[in-house]
């Protein structure tokens, strides 16, 4: 395995199972941004104490508490040139959530949710995650929950933007 694949496999494994060990992968001086379809300000953690509650739901193993059982799978990982000679890793991942009561406040009604995302890690000189930026593709999840989000295919020949205008 490559360095990037090893890092990604360890990271998703700990996200799925051990919050304390996952938090330990991060540097004390950190910036964690988890972007979905919400304001980034509420999603930015700069201390391990702020990070821990953001990661904790992913390691939940109680199928009856409404938090859900989450599973991340790293599908691809690439090492990139980082800053100050330290590596960066970009991770493409799949996520499944089962047994969740709500997703961003929307009732899940027993559905198993799935999406994909991408995470970038800038590592420090000790190999700890100093900066993380994560992007979730929330659109298919919210559509699965019957939220009316349009995803027009603008690139298709003959697309008519007037079809998006309400009558």
Locations of the language-model features?
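C-terminal and inter-domain tail/linker signature
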Residues: 1-167
């Amino acid at each position: 395995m490559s360095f990037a694949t090893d890092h990604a496999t360890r990271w998703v494994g700990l996200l799925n199972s051990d919050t304390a060990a996952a938090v330990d992968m991060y540097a004390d001086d950190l910036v964690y941004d988890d972007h979905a379809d919400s304001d980034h300000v509420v999603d930015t953690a700069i201390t391990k104490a702020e990070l821990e509650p953001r990661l904790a739901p992913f390691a939940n193993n109680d199928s009856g508490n409404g938090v859900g059982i989450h599973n991340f799978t790293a599908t691809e990982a690439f090492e990139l040139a980082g800053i100050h000679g330290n590596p960066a890793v970009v991770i493409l991942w799949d996520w499944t959530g089962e047994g969740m009561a709500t997703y961003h406040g929307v009732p899940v009604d027993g559905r198993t949710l799935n999406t994909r995302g991408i995470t970038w890690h800038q590592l420090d000189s000790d190999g700890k995650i100093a900066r993380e930026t994560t992007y979730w593709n929330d659109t298919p999840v919210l559509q699965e929950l019957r939220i009316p989000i349009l995803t027009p295919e603008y690139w298709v020949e003959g697309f008519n933007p007037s079809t998006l205008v309400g009558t």
